[in-house]
Amino acid sequence: MNKDKSKQKPQKKENNNNNNKNNNNNNNKTENNKTNKDFTKNKFDKDAKIDKVDNKKIFHNRSSQKRIAKLKKIELQKKPLTLKLNEIKSIEQRLIDEAPQRGTNPLANISSTTATTTTTTATKNDKEKEKEYKIDYPSATDFKDLPISQLTLKALTESKFLKLTDIQRASLPHTLCGRDILGAAKTGSGKTLSFILPILETLWRNRWGRDDGIGAIVLSPTRELAIQIFDVLKAVGKYHTFSAGLIIGGRNVQQEKDKINAMNILIATPGRLLQHMDETYGFDCSNLKILVLDEADRILDLGFSKCLNSIVENLPRERQTLLFSATQTKSIRDLARLSLQEPEYISVYEKDITTTPQNLTQTLCVIPLEMKLNMLFSFIKTHLTSKIIVFFASCKQVRFAHETFKLLNPGTTLFPLHGKMKQWTRLEVFEDFCKKKAGTLFATDIAARGLDFPAVEWVIQVDCPDDIETYIHRVGRTARNDAPGQSITILLPSEKDGMVNLMEKQKMKFEILEPNPEKLVSIDSKLSSFLSEKTDLKYLAQKSFVSYLRSVYRQSNKEIFKIQELNINEFSKSLGLLGTPNIQFGKASADSKNKSFVVSNIQKQLKDKKSKGEKDIDSSDDDDDDEERNKIGNSDDEDSEDDSDFQDDSDDDNKKVTKQQPKTNIEKLFDRKNANVMSETYQKLRTKEEDEEDDSMFVVKRRDHDLDNLDIVKRLSRKENKEKNFINDPTKLKFQESTSVPKDGKLPTSYIEKVKSEVEKGDVQDKILLKERLKRKKLKLQSKELRKQSGGGATGDDEEESVAYFVPPGEKDPYENGENDSDDESNDDDVWGQEYNSDDDDDDEESESEEQPKPITKKRTLEDHEESALKFLKKNRI
């Protein structure tokens, strides 16, 4: 224990030494604080060393602190603006310095993005190296190498747009510089980003706001393509503050009018945009910077040329115009001359590269017309897990194929898409098909342009395309973005040679396949059974039959489309029809409603030559026209009628048109040869009736039709009719013949006098009875008063007497209505309750008047009442 104490003593000494050291340190700190306090005594000493002193102790004045805080906030607010301005300056300087030369194609720059790194030796501790790209942006292959804003680049990376496609590499260097472009590229090559990026960057560099109005307009041929462009714009420009609007048909115009003036970017169809230019108040495009025409060839094909010209006239001339198309035709070049200023012609097609994707395998399937649907059903049945698009020539064919194949139930989901559908149903079908991993879409050429259907494996063209451009757009729905794809085009034997020649001119690689008809699944019998059960399907089959033949007849390329070689009867049987429908071609105009296209074209040529003063027509042309007209079976009678308008002259080579004298109605009637065709006035009446039938679709109709068949309603209606007939027609009443009237026609005076005498006697008796009743009532009242005075009262037996009073027939009681009633109703019953004896009935009236009423002492039984009633009745009968 002592040892332990000895060990503890030096520890205490050490603790004391430590405490002394701490005290010395604290003293030193207090001395330093004193010196600081002495230093800050001068409050307004600006030369003081602020870094070594606390700011709160120096600037203890609150006003100075607030001023410094405001300055810091202003600097922080200015930082993003200054950064944005610096970024805009650097991008603009780079665009000026590295702009490609006019007439060059940046796609020719083979050099990849190479960069040299330079190290900065400002300090020895800096180990990082800054990279400076010395390559020009026209040679860029990634979006990050382009002179674009960080907001756009961030959205591109999030949307997984990293590499530039060929059309983007070729067009973006020129469009970012503000040049006009006429670009041509194959479908699925990324043309949408080629004009969306310049729109966003141009408005961003100009610091565009809502008050600046409309800065860019994108015109699309179809609504679906406009919606698709709008979706890409939302994805790429989501970090920008621009307002964008979708202006298409099928939507509420008034809502668009209310919001269109607050938009910066408009994506529209030509018709709806022109409508807003004409109708919307305050619609102003004077500040427009960029105009984009996407799928310009399709816009012109749909007949929007006049609409485009009027739109371009309302836009400012100082603008940037971008025109993109899959094909460049003469009409597009004419449009480019009108709307573009010094354009750059950019095409990504090489001499050895066709306009179709490289990963696309093309097949031509030659088969008869009546085996088309069997071929299609067999193919769908064997490709249930693949995504297929099937193209038809008309809307009626799409509807018929979709309805019948649904009944056949091939085992996959089927979708229809055509121009007769409403806008939002088309949009729903488009979105549903895009989400599906497997399915079949029956569509017209409305789905052939610009629409991006993801992961489409097969494209089947049941009907031959109109031209090679339509073929390119159809097969372009597959093999997009370097993905593999396959296409099958079903051709007739008469269409094979012409289509093969067109594809060989474009240097396309394809295979020709002739399937065995015996191995195909036949659906003719099933279709005929469906049509026999459902009249709607039969109507659709007839319409699809007629629409297909009309589409073939109206084609301009007669080398491919030969209507004379079609087996119409077998084709109608393949659709399930028992007979071939009657067809009448040529309803192009009102003047030639019942004439073929050949005759109407001749009349147009005659009118044109009349206006120019040329009346001569070559006879050779007429002979050719006659041969073509004779080939069409249903137009023989019509053509014979039309030939009467032309008269032969002495010259064999030429024919002259001479004016005919007007004919009377009778002459026209006898000269008429085709009795099945109605006159123009009757056709107008038919169109009016059809319009009225269409209008009646929207009329509200009564639904409770079963009420008309109820028996109750019929009975009530009969009663009402009977009453009305009885009231309105009194002449129909028949009276019964009276037998009392003598044959001489004199009135029965003796009978009338007899009746009068009987009535007078009855009146005397009634008066006597009335007097007796009054007397009895008075006597009864007097007897009651006497009893009260004498102290007696009515016994309970008297009050409870059950009496009966019988009024003679035809006699009315004067007290029924309450007249002369007393307060006590029970007393009245006692007065009238009296016995009638047989002796009283034999007495005269005088003896009855002398008799006085006797009080009732006995209680009357039911037998007594019956006897009194019988006596009373016998007396009245006498």
From Swiss-Prot:
Residues 1-15, 31-53, 608-618, 665-674, 860-869 have a biased composition (Basic and acidic residues). Residues 102-112 have a biased composition (Polar residues). Residues 635-652, 816-850 have a biased composition (Acidic residues). Keywords: ATP-binding, Helicase, Hydrolase, Nucleotide-binding, Nucleus, Ribosome biogenesis, RNA-binding, rRNA processing. GO terms for cellular component: nucleolus; nucleus. Residues 1-53, 102-130, 608-675, 781-878 are annotated as: Disordered. GO terms for molecular function: ATP binding; ATP hydrolysis activity; RNA binding; RNA helicase activity. A motif (DEAD box) lies at residues 294-297. CDD domains: DEADc_DDX10, SF2_C_DEAD. Its EC number is 3.6.4.13. This is Probable ATP-dependent RNA helicase ddx10. The gene is ddx10.
